[in-house]
């Protein structure tokens, strides 16, 4: 779901800023 995607992305962003989101997509 969209909420789950956002949750995973935010969690990954907090752990690894400027690296990867919850789905392994590169985030700047």
UniProtKB/Swiss-Prot annotation:
Q: What is its EC number?
A: 3.1.1.4
Q: Report the protein name in the record.
A: Phospholipase A2
Q: Which family does it belong to?
A: Belongs to the phospholipase A2 family.
Q: What does this protein do?
A: PLA2 catalyzes the calcium-dependent hydrolysis of the 2-acyl groups in 3-sn-phosphoglycerides.
Listed GO biological process terms:
lipid catabolic process
- What is the required cofactor set for this protein? Ca(2+)
Q: How is the cofactor bound?
A: Binds 1 Ca(2+) ion.
Q: In which tissues is it expressed?
A: Expressed by the venom gland.
Q: Which domain of life is it from?
A: Eukaryota
């Amino acid at each position: 779901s969209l909420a789950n995607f956002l949750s995973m992305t935010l969690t990954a962003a907090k752990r690894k800023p400027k690296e990867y989101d919850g789905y392994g997509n590169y985030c700047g």
